């Protein structure tokens, strides 16, 4: 293997002294239109980018432990109990995906995992969602089960919500799974419908610039904004039970409140 896939397989072999049984990848994403609109049952426009997370995986049933390595971190992490890790917090993303899959009855077991990423960390390009999706794809191949793409997105979102502690919507995971080259992705969140729209103009280029400002859903005010949005939705729902999300509230109603 060459490139990023070769890097992650080398990482696996260096960390665990064996060849990874399977390799999976998932792209980061850029948000074109829509911010905090996914969990308010609104609409977004996004696209996948040409930076990806690669995951190599193998079973570790003999030891019963979970072992994780990354090209971005020097330490190989070994855990026997699947619980949130305060140190080496990056392992919470794949461990969370495992836990949600296990809780939902998928036949997953202990694993060894190596990670390589060209998605800049903390740049707001959803490296965490790409890692979750790549982990889910790797585990489905490793343990021989099928999972529908939309269900995988929900599994990854649940992992980030309940295990990592970031109350994200589905924008990031959906974009990583359904994004397509030279297309933007339109997502409607009340019914979870999506459409890939071709970029018709061949001369159109979407440039993404790294600002240098680090971003984290866990430590930022993201969870506070979500709580505030849900509080506002509850306010309007009490006055009109038909309004179940901020999507249902007009600008005039917001201004009047």
Predicted ranges, named:
Residues 41-48, 225-226:
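Short Gly/aromatic-enriched secondary-structure transition segments
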Residues 46-48, 56-60, 105:
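Short, charge-rich binding segments
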Residues 49, 98, 230-233:
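Short, amphipathic alpha-helical segments that act as regulatory/interfacial helices
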Residues 1-22, 27-30, 34, 40-43, ...:
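Gly/Ser-rich oxyanion-binding loop with an adjacent helix/lid
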Residues 51, 109, 113, 203-205:
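Residues at beta-strand starts and edge strands
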Residues 34-36, 48-49:
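N-terminal cofactor/phosphate-binding cores enriched in small/glycine residues
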Residues 39-41, 237-238:
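Short amphipathic alpha-helical segments with coiled-coil-like heptad repeat character
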Residues 2-29, 54-87, 183-257:
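C-terminal nucleotide
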């Amino acid at each position: 293997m060459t490139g990023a896939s070769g890097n992650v397989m080398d990482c696996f072999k260096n960390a665990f002294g064996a060849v990874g049984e399977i390799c999976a990848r998932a792209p980061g994403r850029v948000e074109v239109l829509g911010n905090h609109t996914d969990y308010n049952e609104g609409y977004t426009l996004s696209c996948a980018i040409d930076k990806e997370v690669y995951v190599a995986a193998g079973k570790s049933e003999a030891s019963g432990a979970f072992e994780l390595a990354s090209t971005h971190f020097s330490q190989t992490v070994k855990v026997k109990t699947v619980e949130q890790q305060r140190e080496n917090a990056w392992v919470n993303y794949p461990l969370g995906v495992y836990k949600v899959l296990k809780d939902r009855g998928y036949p997953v077991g202990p694993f060894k995992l190596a990670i390589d990423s060209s998605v800049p960390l903390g740049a707001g390009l959803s490296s965490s969602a790409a890692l979750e999706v790549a982990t889910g794809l790797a585990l489905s191949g490793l343990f021989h089960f099928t999972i529908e793409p939309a269900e995988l997105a929900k599994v990854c979102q649940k992992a980030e919500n309940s295990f990592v502690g970031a109350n994200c919507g589905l924008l990031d995971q959906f974009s990583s799974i359904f994004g397509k080259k030279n297309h933007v992705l339109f997502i409607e969140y009340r019914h979870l419908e999506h459409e890939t729209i071709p970029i018709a103009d061949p001369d159109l280029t979407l440039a993404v610039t790294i600002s240098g400002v680090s971003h984290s859903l866990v430590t930022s005010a993201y969870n506070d904004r979500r709580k505030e949005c849900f509080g506002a939705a509850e306010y309007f729902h009490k006055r009109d039970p038909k309004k179940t999300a901020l999507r249902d509230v007009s600008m005039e109603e917001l201004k009047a409140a």
